[in-house]
Regions:
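Membrane-interface helix-boundary motifs at transmembrane edges
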Residues: 1, 61-70, 92, 120-132
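Helix-loop junctions on the outward
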Residues: 8-41, 84-93
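Alpha-helical transmembrane segments in multipass membrane proteins, preferentially the mid-helix core
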Residues: 56-59, 84-85, 106-128, 136, ...
């Protein structure tokens, strides 16, 4: 299933990120460069798993004939805008706050789509079981994904706290990827 694929991809990337983080701290402890956040690795993981989570919404609705391909592409596109703008802001390739705002606007669009837009309208025409699954995933995308902008803030500004950022991102990933 898509949920198992999301969990498997996350497990693989977290195994790799753990090694990166451990090696970075060992280098710092030995007098080398300061340990940094595995930002690129984290965004690679998200660029795979987040669109898969969005696809799961579509597949649940498509399985009962209640979704259009256009709905999938709108959700997929919004998820990419959200992630790419977040990466550009966090990596310093773009201005931090405007990139956060663009990413949040894309996330808000996804939230709108699943609570009031075509995705919601499609879900309303399905069975009670499908409605239940859809609502559970909608809550995860709304509440669970709200953790990420908080983490983003921890890594920005003149005194970023990368340890707190990574702890918060790890908690968010565990909550969101296992609950999904």
């Amino acid at each position: 299933t898509v949920a198992a694929l999301v969990t498997g991809v996350a497990w693989y990337h977290y195994t790799y990120m753990r090694e990166h983080w451990a090696n970075a701290y060992a280098t710092e402890a030995a007098g080398g460069a300061e340990a940094t956040s595995p930002l690129v690795l984290r965004y690679i993981d998200w660029l795979i798993t987040v669109p898969l989570q969005v696809a799961e919404f579509y597949l649940i609705l498509a399985a009962v004939g209640a979704a259009t391909a256009m709905l999938f592409w709108r959700l997929f596109g919004a998820s990419l805008v959200m992630l790419i703008s977040g990466f550009l802001g966090e990596s310093g390739q773009g201005p931090e706050m405007p990139m956060l705002i663009i990413g949040c606007l894309a996330w808000f669009y996804i939230i709108y789509e699943i609570w009031a837009g075509d995705a919601k309208k499609s879900a309303d025409t399905t069975s009670e079981g499908t409605k239940f699954a859809f609502k559970a995933m909608a809550l995860i995308l709304t509440v669970g994904w709200a953790i990420y902008p908080a983490g983003y803030f921890l890594g920005t500004g003149d005194d970023p706290n990368f340890d707190a950022l990574n702890i918060l991102y790890n908690i968010a990933d565990v909550v969101n990827k296992t609950a999904f």
